[in-house]
């Protein structure tokens, strides 16, 4: 969770989504939020879980993860990230309700 005190900290956000259109749309939503809120956000996009974990370097504040990706899906990606970064906020982006409970296993939102 962020605590904003005084000047805003630039938040580092990762978007991990294999579908180009969905990835661009989510990045667009984040950019719109940045414009409307006046916050500075550094957004990095990845097309698959394998891209962010090979090797994962802690430093992101929030990671938006698609659940179903061809090479490395969202759950195994989250599990690998949690091994080295217990503090990053993980947010699963999916329309598949059956994954909601599993998300709690890796302390995701």
Regions found by a protein language model. Name each.
Residues 6, 36, 55-56, 83:
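Generic structural signal for beta-strand residues in well-ordered domains
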Residues 42-62:
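Acidic, metal-coordinating helix/loop segments flanking the phosphotransfer/catalytic sites
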Residues 10, 40-42, 87, 108-109:
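A generic structural signal for alpha->beta connector loops
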Residues 19-44, 83:
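Two-component/phosphorelay signaling modules centered on CheY-like receiver
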Residues 1-9:
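Short, Lys/Arg-enriched N-terminal segments with co-localized hydrophobic residues
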Residues 54, 60-109:
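CheY-like receiver
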């Amino acid at each position: 969770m962020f605590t904003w005190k005084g000047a805003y900290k630039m938040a580092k956000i990762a978007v991990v989504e294999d579908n180009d259109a969905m990835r661009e749309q989510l990045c667009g939503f984040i950019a719109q939020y940045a414009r409307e809120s006046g916050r500075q956000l550094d957004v990095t996009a990845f097309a698959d879980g394998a891209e962010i974990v090979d090797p994962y370097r802690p430093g992101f504040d929030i990671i938006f993860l698609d659940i179903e990706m061809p090479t490395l899906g969202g759950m195994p990606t989250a599990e690998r990230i949690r091994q080295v970064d217990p503090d990053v906020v993980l947010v699963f982006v999916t329309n598949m309700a059956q994954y909601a409970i599993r998300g709690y296993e890796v302390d995701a939102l």
